[in-house]
Amino acid sequence: TGNLFAIGLLFSTAMAFTGCSTVDDGSYTAPITLSEKISGKWVVNSVMQTDEANARTKTLTDLLDFDTFVINLNQDEAGNPSTFTVEGSAPLLLPTSGTWKMDYNFTKSDNTPSRLLLNDGKAETALTVTAVPGNTKTLEYRLTRKTNGQPFVSYTYNLTQAVK
């Protein structure tokens, strides 16, 4: 029993010293926000119009100069959303300049889509984000027009980040 007690004492002493770890896990890094992923200069890949009443779609990319569409989503020095500008000669479905922000800066736990909010000082335009840049530098959002609360037409913009 004396040997068993000595082994137990040795084992518990060894565990006490090895239980304290001095491994440095690094410093805290803030999570990547949707604003960080979405900010930048985006050029159009395609624009689709959807008739919400009967789900018919039409490609508008090569019509009405949509292929000239560019949106710049700028950040301030702290990395927060700041201003935006829209360039090109496509029809003005969006405001041409103002401020932007996300309705929620992270992926939502209830799987509802995030909204990109454009404010030109007069009104706020909400764009439903349908694809977020990741491995591919593709951003997609949908602008939905409504009358009496009912959607009647939507425009889906598929964009690629411009080369700097």
Where are these regions (language model features)?
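C-terminal motif of bacterial Sec signal peptides marking the signal peptidase cleavage site
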Residues: M15-G19
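Bacterial N-terminal signal peptides that target proteins for export
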Residues: T1-I7
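Lipid interaction determinants
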Residues: S21-P95, D103-K164
